[in-house]
Structures are given as C-alpha cells and as structure tokens.
Amino acid sequence: MPNKLLIVESPNKVKTIQKYLGDEYEVKSSVGHILKLSTKGEYHLGIDFDNWEPIMIVDSTKTKIIKELKDAAKNADEILVATDPDREGEAIAKNLVDTLKVQDKYKRIKYNEITKEAIEYAINNPLEIDENLVKAQKTRRLLDRIIGFKLSELMQKKIKNAPTMPSAGRVQSIALKLVCDREKEIESFIPIKYSKIEANIDNFNNPTFYYKLANKDFDNDNTWISPTKIEKIYDDVKTNNKLKIIDIKITKSKEKQIIPFKQSILYKDAKYSSQIVQSSAQSLFEHGLISYPRTDSTRISESFIQKAKKYIAEKFGNEYVANDVKGFSGEQDAHEAIRPTNIELTPDFAKINYSLNEIDTYIYTLIYNRTISAIMATPIRETHHYDLLNKTATNEYYFKTSYSKLLFDGYYKVLGYPEMPSLIPNYQIGDYLDVNEYIRLDKQTQPPARYNDGSLIKKLDDIKVGRPSTFASTVSVIKKRLFVETHEDKTLHPTEFGKTVLEKLINGFPKTINEEYTAQVEEVLDEISDGKQDYKKLL
C-alpha cells in the first residue's frame, strides 16, 4: 500500500507521474484551485479590509475532491505538493497544505518538465512553500477583484441593452484599449502616394531581376519618388536602355541567432488562435514532451544544451554546433524557455509514439525546431551589392541591387532554406547591361497592421502587462464578451460595443485604464514575489 501522497493540479498528469514513481506513491489531482474568493464582506468583494486578507471559501465543485485528498493524506507518511511552479501553483499548494492540515508532513516539490529524471530530482530536492509567491498571487487576486468589480459596476450602470453583461478587468481593459487604439490609428491614417522605377534585365538563365533607383535627390530611403516628379524622371530614364556597373561590393554576414520560445513568441509564431496554442502546449507538457509552457524566459539549462550539442554533432557534424550559445536569458529564473524534454524525441517519432493529433504535432514541431536551431551554428551568407548608372543626355540616375548566396547553411538545415538565386551573375565593374524595359510602380504607404491573437499577446508582453499564465485567457475574454471580433484573416477588430465600453472606462477610471499603471502593478507584483515589497502597501 502506498505510504506517500503526491498531489498535482491537473488530472492529466496523474497517469504519467504514477508510472514514473511506482507503487510507493499515490498520485492524485486537486483539479486546479480548491478554494475560491467569496463575495461576502464589504461591497461583496470577499476582502477583510481590517487586515487586507482574502475571505476564502471551499469551491463547491471541489468538495468531493477535498474529501478524497484528506482521506489519502491521513494514510500517508509524507505529502508531496507538486502543483505548477508559478504564483497560481504556489497559492494552490498553500491552500492544499492548510485545508488538508498537513503542515507537519508536507514537502513542496517543483519541476519544469514531466520526465522521470525531473520528478526524481524534485523529490530528492524538496522545498518549502514560497510565501512571497503566495502573497503576490493573493495581491493579484484581490487587485483584480477590487478593480474588476468597480469597473464592471460602472459598466452595468452606464451601458444599457448591451449584447453581453458589461464587465471589465485590469488587464483585459488594456488589451481592449490596444485593439481600439490601433483601429483609431488605421481610421486616421492618411496614405502617402509614391512611385518607384525598376529596370528589368535578363541575366543568362537566371530569373528576371529588378534594379531599384537609388538617386539621393529623391527621398530619404533613396527609392521613393513623389508623384509630382515621376513623369519627367520616368520619361528621361527610358531614353537610355543600358545600365553601367560602376561599383561592386562583396560582404559576408552571419544570420541572427535563433532565440528559444517563450510563451508570447510561440503565440505570435503559431498559426492557430491563442486558446488552441495554449491548450496544445499544456497537453504536450502534461504528456512529458515539452517543458513548462507558461514562461517568459528564454533560458535553456546547461545540461540540455550539452545533450543537444552532442545530438547536433552526431546528426549534422561538429561544424553545425554553435560555439557559444548567446542571447538567452542569463538570469537563473525559475523557468526555462519552452523546449522539448528530450532532443531525441523528433517530431516524427513523437507523432507516432505519442499519437499526437495534427495541432499537437504542429506545435511540437515548432518548439522542437526552434530549440535545436537555437543551439546550432548560424548560417553565413555572401552578398554581392551592385551600383549601376543610367546616364542620359540631361541627367544621371543610379540603380542598385544585390544577390546573396549561402556559404554555410547552419540552422537552415532544420528551419528550411530562404529563397535565393541559383547562381550569382559574373558581373565586372564597367560592364553594360541591356534593359528590357523600365517599370514604373505607383504605390502608397500602408496603415499599421491590426493585431491578431499572437501579435496582441506579444504587445502585452512587450509593455509588461499581464503574465504568461493569463495571456491567452485575456484575449479569449475580450472576444467572449463581444468587445472585439475576429475576422477571416484572423485580425482583431473592436466592436461598437467594445468601443463604448472602453470610452466609459477611460472616462470613469483614467488613471487605471492605461498601460503605464498596469505595467507598474506587474512590476510591484514581481517585487512582492521577490520579497522586496509589502503586498498590503500596494493594496
């Protein structure tokens, strides 16, 4: 009979962890939070304002689970609390220990991946509950209740006949504001018309290339021409159908190093909605295929890097191993980047042996390829830059173009190759090239792009609003409440209802509904997590 009880949050982890630990342990799940914030007390906020403590009650849906956990705890000599390694997980751990009354025989264990090695290491290196993390979660929860209740109360008074119950929250209001602000930018955008001239030239068996005008008399980026000047220039350029090569420069450059995924970048790069990506990543984590996905770190453990380097050397050769893996977060934060748990688990192998569906296979492949590419040598390209002269009877016009070729393919072996010409023409300075035709291109500047799920989450992350654990739910909530809608091209558009809600919020709470305030709150929550700030002071 088991004499040790290990408690996790998600029931999906139970079977895998039980398999690793054997009969000595009983693995059970709390199925998330077992307590919830009540609606008792002053203003129905569930807060004891005398000491700024939450009034917590048992979640009625968890009564049976709590009884089962209590019964299991009575028969166990040791309780291992293995909830997730973040603020929410720490709060759940604290509530479990207090509710089960096992303060004298519990151990807190944390792991970033569900593998036998990681679980055993966590068990052999137990911790205490981090009270600072618990305080940060408590502060975040109370803040969200105070602000959310008051904002929602205002909405319900100000907006009648709404399509959904008007409500608002600290972070979701900023997400709505970003979408509405971007829509205003687009609506007020005045396009600027401009023109370009390109020369079409045949180069042996190569595709047709275009040589862009580079006369500095025209504008800042050397290629735009105002519509008022284009006619005269275009007519003059066409009088000479030869371009003379006046300069050739050859440069070598390394491509940028790939940085491993943190959660917001995974959302941005994936082709699915944030909710689908979150669900898939969580499933991959629970099945032991990837590390903890709700992370804002780009750090990879040294032990994994060494294993990956060995794998890369064996599969591709020593020259494909990065000499120095730079660019990752250097601080020893609690989490790593999102990475595979085992570099040997290739996407094809994982798909077959773990019966991954199409979406999970896609997300795992993204994560696997991104990780291995981050530890591979960067590609090197050689670029040939050509300056060309069109000399007419009245003026001189300069054109430019460039060709690149790979000298070393590096991580492109995994990520795929960029489009490049099959060969670089053998031009010399002084050569004349025949122009088939000059092409006038009339264009106009474009407004900023609307957000989609991924780019909105990336923006929230960039301005330090919200946390990895809440990004997907934040976007989901503003959709469900009909504040924004997703169009066929996956872009987010504010509804008239959403615009009205934001207007009322800003008029009622101008200091709260702004990016700077919300980012400052996140900064203080981090300081509380680190024990550097008194949580009651913020509240």
Model-derived segments and their meaning:
Residues 140-152, 199-201, 252-261, 278-290, ...:
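Core structural elements
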Residues 291-316, 473-512:
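Accessory beta->alpha helical hairpin/"wing" motif in late/C-terminal subdomains of nucleic-acid enzymes
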Residues 318-344, 511-539:
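Leucine-rich, amphipathic alpha-helical/linker segments
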Residues 11-14, 31-37, 85-89, 112-117, ...:
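Conserved nucleotide-binding/hydrolysis micro-motifs of P-loop NTPases
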Residues 16-20, 68, 91-99, 118-122, ...:
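Alpha-helical scaffold elements adjacent to nucleotide-binding pockets in ATP/GTP-utilizing enzyme cores
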Residues 1-147, 224, 275, 436:
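Intrinsically disordered, low-complexity regulatory segments
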Residues 26, 35-60, 166-286, 317, ...:
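Long, highly charged, low-complexity internal segments
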Residues 114-201, 250-251:
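C-terminal or mid-to-C-terminal helical accessory/interaction module adjacent to the motor/catalytic core
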